[in-house]
Amino acid sequence: MAYFLSKLIPPRPTFVADMSAEERDVMLAHQDYWLPHINAGLVLVMGPVIDPKGAYGVMIVNTPSLKLLEEWEAQDPVILAGQGFAFENYPMPAVKVAPIEPLAPVSSISP
């Protein structure tokens, strides 16, 4: 298994602030599409990044291969809708992942 940062580039920098009702529906379908991957532990985190230069989406994905990730992305409703979204993928060769159930409380961490 390999980790990738997957960046979803919207059709315009202002997308998060001014998406249409149709675009909002596509985004909801996008979230629903990835939910089984999240539940299976393949997508560790997913959500929007509010960057002053333009918002975008990010996922950290644990998958057997980049090819499989690209196949999943090709079936994402945001891509199938043909509204100008695109994915960029970056390998993460040295990843440390917290356990799902923390072994110690946050208060145990010293500054």
PLM regions and their residue ranges:
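Conserved, structured core segments of small domains
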Residues: 1-111
